[in-house]
Amino acid sequence: MGKKNPNARHTDAATPLTTDDSNSSSVSRRESATESKSASESESSPPRSNTKQSRTHKNVKASGKATVSSSSDSDQAVANSSANDEEKEPVCKIRIVPLEKLLASPKTKERPSRGSQQKNVTINDSSDEEPLKGSKLVLPARKSRNKNASIIELSDSEEVDEEEESLLVAIPLPKEAQQTKPEKNSSKASKESIEKRQKAQKEATTSSARAIRSVNGTRRGSLSSERSSRASSSRAESPPRPKRCVVRLKRVSLPKTKPAQKPKKMSSDSEEAATTSKKSRQRRSKSESEADSDYEAPAAEEEEEEERKSSGDEEEAANSSDSEVMPQRKRRRKKSESDKGSSDFEPEEKQKKKGRKRIKKTSSGESDGDGDDDKQKNKRKHIRKIIKTKDLDLTTKEAAKEEDDRRKRIEDRQKLYNRIFVKSESVEINELVLDFDEESKKALLQVDKGLLKKLKPHQVAGVKFMWDACFETLKESQEKPGSGCILAHCMGLGKTLQVVTLSHTLLVNTRRTGVDRVLIISPLSTVNNWAREFTSWMKFANRNDIEVYDISRYKDKPTRIFKLNEWFNEGGVCILGYDMYRILANEKAKGLRKKQREQLMQALVDPGPDLVVCDEGHLLKNEKTSISKAVTRMRTKRRIVLTGTPLQNNLREYYCMIQFVKPNLLGTYKEYMNRFVNPITNGQYTDSTERDLRLMKHRSHILHKLLEGCIQRRDYSVLAPYLPPKHEYVVYTTLSELQQKLYGYYMTTHREQSGGDVVGKGARLFQDFQDLRRIWTHPMNLRVNSDNVIAKRLLSNDDSDMEGFICDETDEDEAASNSSDSCETFKSDASMSGLAASSGKVKKRKTRNGNAGGGDSDSDLEMLGGLGGGSSVQKDDPSEWWKPFVEERELNNVHHSPKLLILLRLLQQCEAIGDKLLVFSQSLQSLDVIEHFLSLVDSNTKNYEFEGDVGDFKGCWTSGKDYFRLDGSCSVEQREAMCKQFNNITNLRARLFLISTRAGGLGINLVAANRVVIFDVSWNPSHDTQSIFRVYRFGQIKPCYIYRLIAMGTMEQKVYERQVAKQATAKRVIDEQQISRHYNQTDLMELYSYELKPSTEREMPILPKDRLFAEILTEHEKLIFKYHEHDSLLEQEEHENLTEEERKSAWAEYEAEKTRTVQASQYMSYDRNAFGNQVMGQFGNASGSVTSNKIFGFRSDILLQLLNMKISKDHQELNQNQVIQLVPTYLQQLYNEMNNGDPTMYKDLLNLHSNIVHPSGMYMNPLLYANQNPNAAGYNQGTGGVPPMAGGSVAHGPPAAPAPGFEPDKVYEID
């Protein structure tokens, strides 16, 4: 076959290829094309590059013998039958084969090579022949094109359109042409005819090239005529031959189709047939669409194909047709985000659905999406390459550059500030300058010295940090909108005072700073605390003319709007709750006039405040919540976020909060995931490689450095110099026999009967945890739950009764309406006869999701069963599965719960020494049970008749006097009143506070207590950490003791070990709503495993530093299996464990310590009778047990109090804050004097000690004599001491006899 000139361009008009009976008819139609049309096409078509043409030819040549004839055996059979059967009608068929299939290795056996005479062969044997060049598929003009028809035309032009795609088309010719097919040993005449035909084709090619270069219409017409005549003569002389061509298809978008109307309801058989037919049509259309458009397979698909072949599926793949292969590839390609090959052939409706699917697919930066399989949860992933800095979004680079420039300016300014104002020899901070003149070196803005005296060093640094981050300088604040920061100081470090100081400085100097309005947004429980803190700290400032607006005091919206408008016009500080701000800042709020809405938008949004402070800012961690959206709409960029919850490992919270205070600093979410989250997360798996670990550390360091300019962290180690020590004990309690029986039945039988399934049931996990918690608390908890289920059934259809229910997290409007009598509902009138439900009364309480009943605050998954029609309980009630195992009289037996026994014993010991106790629980039902048994103890003390057994526990427990309860049902005013009454150190009767962890774990100050019981484990360990800081904060003067009670061998122990023991709670924030997605099948099976009876024997415990806890360990050996001291606020260090002999020796020393007489020079007891009368010269015996560490014979908390008194006496001009700062200095002086043998200060402390009337925690609580036997404390008196009279008054008790041989004026050697 003659080769054509690649540069030549044919100008013949292309006509449609039809199925006529001869090839000559097709040729004649092509010759009859108008010359003018061909001339215009040749003239208008510009020269094109031959790159794609050459690439196409190269691909075809590279295919070798893998041509169209090897596509499938079925096509060869059709072609052979068409060539050999002379009697059949002529046929012209087009076979379209994807290019990757042609380039692949042939699936049939290779045929033996043939001679040179086999060049002209049939279509079935033409695999060795080079394909015909120059054929092009041309589409008619758009005007003449039928939109609903698919037209294919054949052209001899070699031009390549950039938008078109090439396919090889095999065309079997009619029988007239195939009858002239040359065979082996052909005659000489046939060879001559072939040579003539080739010569004619060569001449036609030459004439075509001349026609393309011609610009004259006449010459072009003559050349076209000459070419046509020569081509006709050559075709007449040469016989027709089989022919192959390259067809190029162009994508044509289909017209929009109207959605089909909903068909009528059909029978099941017809519906199934219609569905099958529809699916087959969809598969067929997908196959055709894929074959017409997508001819290049991705590399991943080629690899999958090769793997499939190598695994033994080669024969199946060879016999499969295109329609069987393409739909599978179509489904895979749907998931590809970058591939859009078949989008033009899809209807618009399908394209939209396809787009919605792609949204769910994680992008390049979200490879660790939550939708992965459980198998991939704990395994490393192949993350994408980290985006380079130059490829980041423009806003990201601009924000990073702006932050870098700001930090450089602050560093330079700080160096100059240190040279001017900071004196290295100065110990106390005399002034805090926020801005100064660089030339004159004069202070332009400084903090009021009255407030400065109240600040600790870390608070001074915090105020300076907030100013630098938000304002930088006075000049910058006037020219730029400013930015924000996060003050991530630990709980109890005085973030409120820092904000008060900064706000006062800005508002007093409003002409310089330009700040008139400061907005404080906080949780509902801390709104009043903020107003109180502003009022109390302003007293120490020289200027206190700042107006503070507490909007929560006003209950109606018109008054709130009026006060907000007044604040906006007059200036000052406004305090709002998060929910109230969300309601008032809502543009679409109902019930407001247009003018009122405009006033609210002006005051709160645009222009809004000049500075906004968001307390407990971790509530803004989700940018999709309505509160986050409302706060983000504020125009001001000067935003301060306060949070005491550590953020080191919660990367998503990082992004949401940083995006709020420093927009675009971390880039888009996709960039943030790619640059930080994926590498850091990928290095935390057990199978992470060394490279993953290095990359994780590297990216963590970069993230820390990037954010240190806008986040300031201070942990609780800052408190250590100012607060007494803290000890935290994790106590593992055993289960009673009844609890073990209930637990075993639930795990083996009841769960299966109720449809329990471990695999993938996160909701079921929560429900089981709630039911099991009721078991290990006390069987009475099961009764409380059953009564609550009955209450829900009775009140499910009564909407009127729902108005009396109280929500655990209520809005301000609801809290205001329920503030009068809501808190009184938690104490039932039926305390004598058990719980209220047992006597027909129902406690009305609303759970977090609005359901009725006294359920748990975080338990929304209880099985309610069917609704009951009356008050009688259905026999098949699933909540009463426990009744066959528990008798009614056993419900009031306190010995069925080791946890309750330990709690009551702690209360008894604390009552004896005057310590106050807090009890935190996640469950409102657990608090109900504790209240119930306190009422039984009260009845036992007052000799009332009751059914039950509370042992030897006695005491008066009256709600509102002896103990308080704080949960979501209490209004803000009631919370404040209860906390104030409890914190009164002279009120020794108020000694217990029951608190719901979710409702009272934030924002309250209860430093009057120094002991905390965490009654149950929380899924979120940060809640327990918040509970600890209710007592361990500034203002605490006693050593703090924390007791975590955990049921041994149960799911509670598994949860604690997973969430707390293996991860420091200060560095972990877990979203409890995502727990079901964080547990795979193996994790769930581990949680459901239990060992109620330990396989090992109880070891001798280490002697605790808390002597009160040592008493309980000695008395209740069978209830406490083991314990360990664990500081949840610090990284744990490996310590050497004591041997068994060393532990026994320590306990023997402790027992001997309890029974011997102790000299006052060594120890001072908390018992009042251990201290004599100074007038009589009797310092008395220090008999009794020791409850704390001693320093020179004093308890550490007593010594701190005495040092405070001495400093106040020596320096009467100092305030309390300055006195506390001098305590370490006086303590060091005491050590030095005692080491040198000088007892001057020691004697002064002894004199102060003897003059104290009621030191905190020093004497026996006088209520002990009024309520119960004084010997109930369990302390043995020394030989020289006189025991107090039963029922006698403490103030008039008999003096203790002096210790033998003890002379007060003599200096004794200190142990």
UniProtKB/Swiss-Prot annotation:
Q: What is its main location?
A: nucleus
What InterPro entries would the database entry show?
A: ARIP4-like (IPR044574), Helicase_ATP-bd (IPR014001), Helicase_C-like (IPR001650), P-loop_NTPase (IPR027417), SNF2-like_sf (IPR038718), SNF2/RAD54-like_C (IPR049730), SNF2_N (IPR000330)
A single GO BP term for this record reads: DNA repair
One MF term from GO for this chain? ATP binding
User: Where's the Helicase ATP-binding domain?
Assistant: 476-664
Q: Which SMART domains match?
A: DEXDc, HELICc
Q: Which reaction does it catalyse?
A: ATP + H2O = ADP + phosphate + H(+)
Please give the residue ranges the record annotates as the region Disordered: 1-384, 837-878, 1285-1311
Under Enzyme Commission nomenclature, its number is 3.6.4.12
Residues reported to bind ATP = H489, C490, M491, G492, L493, G494, K495, T496
Bias (Basic and acidic residues): 28-40, 181-202, 336-351
Deletion: any effect?
Deregulates heterochromatin silencing.
Q: Its GO CC terms?
A: chromosome; germinal vesicle; nucleus
What is this protein's function per UniProt? Global transcriptional regulator. Modifies gene expression by affecting chromatin.
Q: What is this protein called?
A: Transcriptional regulator ATRX homolog
Task: Specify the species.
Answer: Drosophila melanogaster
Q: What is the lineage of its organism?
A: Eukaryota, Metazoa, Ecdysozoa, Arthropoda, Hexapoda
Which gene does this sequence derive from?
A: XNP
